[in-house]
């Protein structure tokens, strides 16, 4: 049942087909003032050029655009990168990471403007509805939530286009645009269309940013990345802000076809879905960080980091960014990353990233101890006592088996 006592709503507005239709629909069905909120998280900047005009023409009372690019990469992407989180061992969580900062900024604006409610354009089949609404209720439970896709009678893009035509709202969307895309500074995703048949190979329409690896340059490119406390601080000896570092890595990654994956994943809402993800800069960063972790983290710390990564991936994917569990995982990941300092030299070539040189002042690797040549620092005879103690449980278990067999005779 619709709550008609909502006088002012802040909508997470993208300028696409869905949110363009939501503005007149809310006004018609709730008699509410609609304020369009646009979060600039690094999506195609050309799409933002006329977005205020589009929102106002659709019926919004005002359109507020906030540049969140630096905050998004610094406070959301980089911290999670330290944890090593990869959802189902593949997905760098590009969409899932953007939702909490959008929702938080939307809620902050709603409270500032004394709005009664917030609204999103996520469908009733996807994960984003859960991510947005879990954030909303966790940050401001007093705000009412409007989720049009769970309320209105529209069933297709064609019906939405007809509705916009009826309301005299212009849109660049069409029946032919069959792919669902999400883009921010960290990644771009593509779903739908030919991807819904698992027997179909992704065509060029399924890739938005990156060159096809086979069409990438025939000559490898060497780059350097400097890292401090698990965060990238410089690319090719140029010290830049978090967003600018990523922007630079994205450009070089796009050129070399880095960061493409085609996956089938388990959605939070129960079904499986297929998507093509492109995370060029992120893929380069992950390789650089893993290279330094191999040098710096001891065995138990590395095992603990792997456990953190697994738990963090589910927490983020499932929309629990603002939970105490996520914060405790983040604290652990941040502590582990305090000694992840150093420099990595990487080779980029036709979709591959290879760390060819690496250095850390905190490295636990010692050439003197690890050498296969004659050395004077590691006495191999010391291993005798260690092996006897380490293998003691196995020895006792074997002795017990022998004794039990003897008793059975």
UniProtKB/Swiss-Prot annotation:
Molecular function (Gene Ontology), one example: ATP binding
Reaction equations catalysed: L-citrulline + L-aspartate + ATP = 2-(N(omega)-L-arginino)succinate + AMP + diphosphate + H(+)
Keyword Ligase: yes
Residues that coordinate or bind L-aspartate: 123, 127-128
Entry EC no(s): 6.3.4.5
Keywords recorded for this protein, A-Z: Amino-acid biosynthesis, Arginine biosynthesis, ATP-binding, Cytoplasm, Ligase, Nucleotide-binding
Enzyme class: ligase
Pathway(s) per entry: Amino-acid biosynthesis; L-arginine biosynthesis; L-arginine from L-ornithine and carbamoyl phosphate: step 2/3
Binding site for L-citrulline: 91, 127, 131, 180, 189, 265, 277
InterPro entries for the chain: Arginosuc_syn_C, Arginosuc_syn_N, Arginosuc_synth, Arginosuc_synth_CS, Arginosuc_synth_type_1_subfam, AS_cat/multimer_dom_body, Rossmann-like_a/b/a_fold
BP GO annotations: argininosuccinate metabolic process; L-arginine biosynthetic process; urea cycle
Record: residues binding ATP: 12-20, 39, 121
Matching CDD domains: ASS
Localization: Cytoplasm
Main location: cytoplasm
Regions that span the bilayer: none
GO CC field: cytoplasm
Family: Belongs to the argininosuccinate synthase family. Type 1 subfamily.
Complexes and interactors: Homotetramer.
Protein name: Argininosuccinate synthase
């Amino acid at each position: 049942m619709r709550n008609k006592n909502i006088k002012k709503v802040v909508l997470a507005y993208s300028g696409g087909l869905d949110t363009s239709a939501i503005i007149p629909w809310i006004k018609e069905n709730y008699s509410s003032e609609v304020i369009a909120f646009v979060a600039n998280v690094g999506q195609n900047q050309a799409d933002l050029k006329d977005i205020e005009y589009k929102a106002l023409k659709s019926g919004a009372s005002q359109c507020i655009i906030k540049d969140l690019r630096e905050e998004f990469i610094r406070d959301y992407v980089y911290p999670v990168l330290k944890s090593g989180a990869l959802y189902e061992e593949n997905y760098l969580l590009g969409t899932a990471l953007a939702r909490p900062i959008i929702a938080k900024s939307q809620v902050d604006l709603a409270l500032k403007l004394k709005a009664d409610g917030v609204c999103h354009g996520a469908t009733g089949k996807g994960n984003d509805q859960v991510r947005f609404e879990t954030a909303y209720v966790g940050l401001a439970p007093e705000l009412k939530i409007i989720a049009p896709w769970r309320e209105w009678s529209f069933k297709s893009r064609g019906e939405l286009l007809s509705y916009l035509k009826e309301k005299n709202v212009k849109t660049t969307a069409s029946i032919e645009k069959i792919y669902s895309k999400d883009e921010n500074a960290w990644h771009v995703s593509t779903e739908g269309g030919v991807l819904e048949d698992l027997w179909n190979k992704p065509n060029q329409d399924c890739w938005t940013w990156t060159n096809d690896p086979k069409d990438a340059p025939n000559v490898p490119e060497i780059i350097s990345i400097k890292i401090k406390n698990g965060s990238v601080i410089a690319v090719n000896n140029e010290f830049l802000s978090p967003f600018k570092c990523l922007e630079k890595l994205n450009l070089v990654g796009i050129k070399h076809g880095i960061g493409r994956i085609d996956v089938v994943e388990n959605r939070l809402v129960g079904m499986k879905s297929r998507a093509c993800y492109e995370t060029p800069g992120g893929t380069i960063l992950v390789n650089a960080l893993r290279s330094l972790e191999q040098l710096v983290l001891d065995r138990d710390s590395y095992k603990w980091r792997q456990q953190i990564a697994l738990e963090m991936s589910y927490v983020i994917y499932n929309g629990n960014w603002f939970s105490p569990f996520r914060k405790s995982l983040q604290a652990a990941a941040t502590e582990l990353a305090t000694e992840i300092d150093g420099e990595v030299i990487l080779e980029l070539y036709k979709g591959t990233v290879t760390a060819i040189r690496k250095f850390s002042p905190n490295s636990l690797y010692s050439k003197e101890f690890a050498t296969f040549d004659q050395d004077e620092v590691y006495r191999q005879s010391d291993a005798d006592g260690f092996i006897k103690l380490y293998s003691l449980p196995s020895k006792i278990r074997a002795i017990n088996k022998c004794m039990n067999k003897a008793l059975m005779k």
